[in-house]
Every structure is written in structure tokens, then in C-alpha cells.
Amino acid sequence: VIHQVTAENKPFLDICLGMQLHFEGSDESQGVEGLHVLDGQILRIPDQSGLKIPHIGWNSLHLQNDGRLFAGLEENPYVYFVHSYYLKAADEQIVKATTQYSTTIHASVESGNTFACQFHPEKSGTVGLSILKNFAKLQGGNA
């Protein structure tokens, strides 16, 4: 179904593990293929003194490349994360937001009408609600 929806260029939003499944594979499940919808690898967040893994909590986003999900948001909005693995996208142009947690994390990507967020917009207060409204508008909704 995911391949069909993305092939038809219908707006599609993946969150957290859903984002990770869109790529080639993951350190979390070595030898298990991802869906290959987008190019990139899912890597374990590097251990760094003073940082806990899993990464649970609020981090600011660095917005880039004019992501449609982030239209109308202030610079460096805070969103909520819960993860131990992160995306390293093969194509930097699809990366629409990054955050820092031991390394640069590709926190959101957009390719055509496929959107994905490592963070949880549904747990990210008014910023998350704005992101979800922007996605609804892409589907013709009156968010």
C-alpha cells in the first residue's frame, strides 16, 4: 500500500518508526530490508558522555530547504522526540529539518508528496498541531 500511495504521488506522512521504514535498512534490524521508498540508512545514535539513549524529550529543529510541513512556523521550533536511531539521508535536498543530539539528525524529510518526521508532531504541542494542519492542507483539508 505504501509503495502504491507514494507511486501515485498522494500526500503521505510517516512518523518515527514509519519514517525509518521508508529507507534502505536500519542498524536496529541488520539484514532486514527497509521499503526503499527513499535512499538513506538508519543508524544508532552515537554514545556521548552526558547524553542518554534513547533520546526522549524536546529538541529544537533547524529548518532548511523550504519544507512545506513547516510553513508559517517560527525559527528553531521545539518538537518532541523518542528514539535511539536516526536517519542519514543519501540526498541532503530532501532533508527539511535537522536537530542535534550527539550528531546531526535528519529530523524531517520531504520528497514529492512523501513526508516523514523522526519526532512526534502529535506530542509536540501547538508546533506539532501546526505541522499536522499543514499536512492536512496538502490533502485539500481545511485545517
Give the ranges of each region predicted by the language model.
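Amide-donor transfer/coupling interface in amidating biosynthetic enzymes
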Residues: 4-7, 41-143
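Cysteine-nucleophile active-site neighborhood
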Residues: 1-56
